[in-house]
Amino acid sequence: MIATNNIFNIRVGKQPWFGQVGTKKGFVEFETREHAIRAWLVLMRTYRRQYQRYTIRDIVGRFAPPNENDTAAYVRYCAQQLCYSAHSPLRLAQDYCRLGVAMAWMETATKLTADDIYEVMKKYNIFIV
């Protein structure tokens, strides 16, 4: 199931997201895909700055916990797509853009490009590193 434009399957939180137009079965519905990408970028920035999640394993482990996902397979897939070890820290904006491509595919089989994510990153000035 994919809630409207929620290409990362972002769950409803305490505060509504920018561009949130509703909810569906515990997931956010976004006005546009761009809003979903923006929300994912904000989450990634929060993971890095507040929770010190720097590696694919740490990020995916928090985003897609084992009680809801095959987290180990998810981590392997993302690491393969980035050609990184699951334990290597992400250091560049490009790394996060590529991770977003892999995560959107894992979550909803949505095909994004790193440029799709980078354009939203620039537009809203959401730089993670």
List where the protein language model places each region.
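Cell-wall polysaccharide-cleaving catalytic domain and substrate-binding groove, primarily
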Residues: 1-129
